[in-house]
């Protein structure tokens, strides 16, 4: 499909061809959900921990004799039913990461790109370059383009001034093409691709 290219100033800068195999797929929310769940599981720290009865700092001696007191039979005060005892089946330090086939991950990325195209939430910019690293100036440019919540994807090398100027603007993310991912595409309103990013995606999925 043919897609209009704009400059950061909002002027026309020609057209670019977008492959239907990447940007023209029918939506599959189940695949997107699987990929996002996989991404978030990888990010989760998993440092949660509660001490079990073997780990709490408390005597392990029998509380009182077995018979003759008329009270219930107990052994260690570390048991979970007692205040200060260990937690039964508590959380342990672990990795929440799980496997997801590479083909499903690749399909998820293409589906996310297609969903943004279908929602008319994609803008292609000829070049993501800022003359100076000034947040105020770049924020004004974004406001003119109507970009209040957006993910910018540049080429393999990001322009230093653009990256610095954009990083203090709320709800704006800037990533090189290597960092493109389903979660960041879905969580932001608009997807802004540079021409270099489009070419890299075409090369990646051809």
Curated annotation (Swiss-Prot):
What does the UniProt function comment say about this protein?
One of the primary rRNA binding proteins, this protein initially binds near the 5'-end of the 23S rRNA. It is important during the early stages of 50S assembly. It makes multiple contacts with different domains of the 23S rRNA in the assembled 50S subunit and ribosome. Forms part of the polypeptide exit tunnel.
Provide the residue span(s) of the region labelled Disordered: 63-97
This one is known as Large ribosomal subunit protein uL4
Q: Gene3D superfamilies this protein is in?
A: 3.40.1370.10
* Keyword tags: Ribonucleoprotein, Ribosomal protein, RNA-binding, rRNA-binding
Report quaternary structure and partners. Answer: Part of the 50S ribosomal subunit.
Native organism taxonomy:
Bacteria, Pseudomonadati, Pseudomonadota, Alphaproteobacteria, Hyphomicrobiales
Q: Which residues lie in Basic residues bias regions?
A: 64-77
Q: Which GO terms describe its biological process?
A: translation
Any one GO CC term of the record:
ribonucleoprotein complex
Quote the gene name from the UniProt entry. Answer: rplD
């Amino acid at each position: 499909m043919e897609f209009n290219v704009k400059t950061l100033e909002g002027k026309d800068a020609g057209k670019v061809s977008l492959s239907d195999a990447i940007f023209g797929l029918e939506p599959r929310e189940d695949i997107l959900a699987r990929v996002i769940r996989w991404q978030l599981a990888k990010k989760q720290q998993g440092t949660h921990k509660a001490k079990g009865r073997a780990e709490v700092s408390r005597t392990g001696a029998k509380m009182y004799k077995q018979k003759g007191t008329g009270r219930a039979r107990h052994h260690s005060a570390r048991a979970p039913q007692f205040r200060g005892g260990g937690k039964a089946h508590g959380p342990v330090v672990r990795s929440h990461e799980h496997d997801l086939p590479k083909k499903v991950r690749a399909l998820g990325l293409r589906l996310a790109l297609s969903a943004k195209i279908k929602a008319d939430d994609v803008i292609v910019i000829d070049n993501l370059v800022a003359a100076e690293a000034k947040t105020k100036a770049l924020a004004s440019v974004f406001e003119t383009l109507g970009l209040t919540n957006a993910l910018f994807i540049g080429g393999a090398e990001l322009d230093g001034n653009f990256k610095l100027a954009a990083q203090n603007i709320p709800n704006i993310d800037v990533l090189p093409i290597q960092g493109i991912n389903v979660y960041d595409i879905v969580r932001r309103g608009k997807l802004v691709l540079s021409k270099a990013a489009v070419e890299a995606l075409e090369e990646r999925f051809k």
